[in-house]
A protein has these predicted regions:
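Conserved alpha/beta enzyme-core scaffold
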Residues: 1-170
Length: 170
């Protein structure tokens, strides 16, 4: 079997300008910082990020936002990163806000190859703008489309040659 363990340099060869990158951290905690630092050093830009939040300015995707390397982000909030708010208000960072449970379901749908998820969350609010609404048994739902990425970054404590990842404390 071909090993699924790669060097940092090998990984960075697969990361390019303009890609959609999913960040598997929690507000910058448990971020794949070595890879993110390598992306900064390589000069990767125009990243379309999918992340639970914009993180803190010095952690995770937050580092890339501060360096103006992220052009858009699909996220649940940006409140921990003042630079993200500044860039959003200046029109430098496109932000799609998604309720956290809906965000998680959209990520899951993308990974499972599903066409989307129906949710009542956001019906009757600005969240429904531009989305398909369905009525099932008299109840309104929004169709939320899956999130897909070219690359997903996760930090694991250990990995084996088959690609299995092991995480600290779980």
């Amino acid at each position: 079997m071909l090993s699924k363990v790669f060097s940092l340099q090998d990984i960075l060869e697969h990361i390019h300008d303009g890609q959609t990158i999913m960040f598997g951290d929690w507000h910058g905690q448990f971020a794949a910082d070595e890879i993110i630092d390598g992306m900064l050093e390589k000069g990767v830009k125009d990243i379309k990020a999918i992340a639970v939040s914009a993180g803190y300015p010095g952690q995770g995707v937050g580092k890339l936002i501060v360096a103006h390397r992220v052009s858009s982000i699909v996220t649940t909030h940006i409140g921990l990163n003042p630079e993200a708010l500044k860039q959003m208000l200046a029109g430098e960072l496109a932000v799609e806000f998604v309720p956290q449970g809906t965000w998680a379901e959209r990520v899951r749908c993308g990974g499972a190859g599903l066409g989307g998820v129906l949710t009542p969350t956001g019906v009757g609010t600005s969240v429904e703008e531009g989305k398909q609404k369905l009525v099932i048994d008299g109840k309104e739902y929004l169709l939320e489309l899956p999130l897909h990425a070219d690359v997903a970054l996760v930090k694991a404590t250990k990995a084996d040659t088959a690609g299995n990842l092991y995480f600290r404390m779980n």
